Amino acid sequence: MELSFTKMHGTGNDFIMVNGSNYPDLDFSKLARQLCRRHFSIGADGLIIVLPPESVEHDFRMRIFNADGSEAEMCGNGIRCFAHYLRENNLTTRDVLKIETLAGIITPEIVSYNGDKSLIKVNMGRPHFKSEEIPVNIEDELDYVKNFPLKIGNKKLNINCVSMGNPHTIIFVEDVNQIPVSTWGQEIEHNPLFPQKTNVEFIQIQSEDEIIMRVWERGSGITLACGTGACASVVAGIKNGLLKNMVTVHLPGGDLNIEWQEQDVFMTGPAESVYTGKIVIQEG
């Protein structure tokens, strides 16, 4: 079977985009495992499926699968690529969209569109802090998991937990370049403290409006960027009195601008097409 796709990225967080309406019988989890393998297939951090909405009040529905085949609730860089895909493929002429995700309705706005690249601002919704909402397995439920001690090997870390529709664990460090992101990230992701696993962000504070971030994504490993992670990290920094309300997040794949005024979080960043193609996949 021949499958059409588009390869896109948002600040280096790369995705394979597929119009799911054309392939209603595909196992998308299996497809993600097949296509996201770097060096052996197309290679990507995740697979994004474009679908019609379940409600007439919304525009489209997004499903996103990590490289390991697990389905994610939401992805900040992915939702920007999703909006860019819709415009590039003439599936919409609207600038503001209502997209159904497992994390709820997300509203991206196409600020500018220039052929293969867009600048997109996304209302990411409100962050959640209660331990049961993230979720975090803590005996005494907390309104905010702030600087909670977690031992990794011989190292004791202070973690902060925020949900942006998906779970994030934020750790403030002096120098992100000195952190074994792969080792610590994998251990924290699979720690029994997190029944649904967790994304892990390591944050170096540059100033009140600037941070450096490294990320270990649940189900994908080290990536060049994570939009929901950038949002969660800025929110955690503000909650800890370390950051102002508008922050630039420096990631290996580029910069994201995050704003939080105690209600909804807004993220602004690019989305870019890399190429389109077709690949033969085995059914069944």
From Swiss-Prot:
One of the protein's GO biological processes: lysine biosynthetic process via diaminopimelate
Pfam families per UniProt: DAP_epimerase (PF01678)
Annotated site (Could be important to modulate the pK values of the two catalytic cysteine residues): 168, 217
UniProt cross-references to PROSITE patterns, sorted A to Z: DAP_EPIMERASE
Gene Ontology molecular function, alphabetical: diaminopimelate epimerase activity
Cross-referenced Gene3D superfamilies: Diaminopimelate Epimerase, Chain A, domain 1
Catalytic activity: (2S,6S)-2,6-diaminopimelate = meso-2,6-diaminopimelate
Cellular component GO terms, alphabetical: cytosol
Enzyme Commission number, as recorded: 5.1.1.7
Active site: 75, 226
Pathway it works in: Amino-acid biosynthesis; L-lysine biosynthesis via DAP pathway; DL-2,6-diaminopimelate from LL-2,6-diaminopimelate: step 1/1
InterPro entries found in the cross-reference section: DAP_epimerase_AS, DAP_epimerase_DapF
Signal peptide: none
Binding locations of substrate: 13, 66, 76-77, 166, 199, 217-218, 227-228
Top-level enzyme category: isomerase
Biological function: Catalyzes the stereoinversion of LL-2,6-diaminopimelate (L,L-DAP) to meso-diaminopimelate (meso-DAP), a precursor of L-lysine and an essential component of the bacterial peptidoglycan.
Subunit structure: Homodimer.
Similarity annotation: Belongs to the diaminopimelate epimerase family.
HAMAP family tied to this protein: DAP_epimerase
Protein name: Diaminopimelate epimerase
Lineage of origin: Bacteria, Bacillati, Bacillota, Clostridia, Halanaerobiales
